[in-house]
């Protein structure tokens, strides 16, 4: 199966939206979705939401939060990046 890495996954809009798009793709069923963000609190919140949705809908995906970027990208098949530069 594929390893899909989402860099900047802690964003409620990008993270959850992209995870939902992946969940809807029949060709990606069984993939591991690696969530990465430098904000560990946001990463935890998105991971919990994704896991809850995955379990509720009995989806065949693995969700893996990783705070180390190099570890997250190791052996990735796909990488989607959405980050904000600078301060809000």
Regions found by a protein language model. Name each.
Residues 1-88:
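Metallocofactor- and cofactor-centric catalytic cores in central/energy metabolism, strongly enriched
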């Amino acid at each position: 199966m594929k390893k899909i890495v989402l860099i900047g996954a802690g964003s409620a809009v990008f993270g959850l939206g992209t995870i939902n798009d992946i969940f809807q793709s029949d060709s990606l069923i069984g993939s591991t979705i690696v969530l990465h963000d430098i904000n560990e609190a946001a990463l935890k919140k998105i991971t919990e939401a994704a896991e809850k949705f995955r379990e509720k809908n009995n989806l065949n995906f693995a969700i893996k939060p990783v705070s180390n970027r190099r570890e997250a990208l190791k052996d990735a098949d796909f990488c989607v990046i959405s980050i904000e530069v600078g301060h809000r």
